[in-house]
């Protein structure tokens, strides 16, 4: 693998993890959004990654950002104007703990990709000194 290939693959990883972090941030910011303007709560988003072939190596990119398939949660709040006749309000089915774990995972992957770029640059500079 050449210098350019390793940089391109690591850069793809950085970009994918950046998008993943943005999606996680959006989910956390909307964890209490009971009405997203359409009468329904905010729907959790999830990035869908796909493998991208680059010569003889593989990288990654975000293919699309999908709405989560899990249903909404319900909480009992009869005083809420969005409550149904039984007094329940639909809320986003977002777990703050899961999102924070995903954020840590994305951060670590981002750091690993940044380290690959740093090491590739150092190896390239060392080879120029030979």
Predicted regions and their residues:
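Amphipathic alpha-helical polymerization modules
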Residues: 1-130
């Amino acid at each position: 693998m050449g210098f350019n290939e390793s940089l391109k693959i690591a850069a793809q990883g950085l970009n994918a993890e950046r998008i993943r972090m943005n999606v996680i941030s959006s989910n956390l910011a909307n964890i209490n959004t009971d009405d997203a303007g359409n009468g329904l709560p905010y729907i959790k988003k999830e990035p869908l990654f796909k493998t991208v072939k680059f010569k003889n190596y593989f990288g990654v990119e975000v293919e699309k950002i999908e709405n989560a398939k899990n249903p909404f949660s319900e909480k009992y709040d009869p005083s809420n104007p969005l409550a149904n006749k039984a007094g329940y309000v639909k809320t986003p089915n977002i777990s703050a703990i899961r999102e924070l774990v995903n954020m840590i995972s994305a951060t670590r992957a981002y750091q690993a990709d940044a380290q690959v770029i740093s090491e590739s640059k150092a190896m390239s500079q060392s080879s120029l000194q030979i």
